[in-house]
Amino acid sequence: MYKKGIYKILANEPLTATVWRMVLGGDTQWITAPGQFVDIALEGRYLRRPISVCDYDATTLTLIYKVVGEGTAQMSRMAAGGELDLLTGLGNGFDVHNAAQRPLLVGGGVGIPPLYSLAKRLTAQGKRVTAVLGFNRASEIFLAEEFRALGAEVVIATADGSAGIHGLVTDGMAAVSDYTSTSYSLPSLSVLVSVR
């Protein structure tokens, strides 16, 4: 079930050279699970932009997006006080009801943001979360400190070796041994095959 609504932009700020955090105020009751997404209508654009929800509470939701084209570039120019037309409550999200005690979360780049609200939910349940986060280089790292603030163990992998483990997020996974069978992933197909 989804809901259309108008949301107020409370903040829109860069986290890295190409990754931005937007905080929106409005009715979030249709977002019921970590891992869901919203569709954003942009002025002058025919197609809505799907963006995963990084975090949410009763009155706000946080989106983290990468500027890769004209639509997301348009989003990066939006200022606090503006409004956006959103469809919320899209996607199934993650099932957290049967999570193991030591779940492993694996994400690369913009696949990381929806894992944050998942980590938040799991740590609130008393789970000992390990998050393996993959980036191209150290200058592109975001959300690592936020995961740590939740109490999650964080393993960083960078393709160029400038921070953490030198390699892909799958190389970061190889460095983790203390987790149980539940794993959650939002990266590329090759990573999903490795998680399996």
Question: What is each model feature region?
Answer:
Residues 2-82:
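Ferredoxin-reductase
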Residues 70-196:
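FNR/FR-type flavoprotein reductase catalytic core
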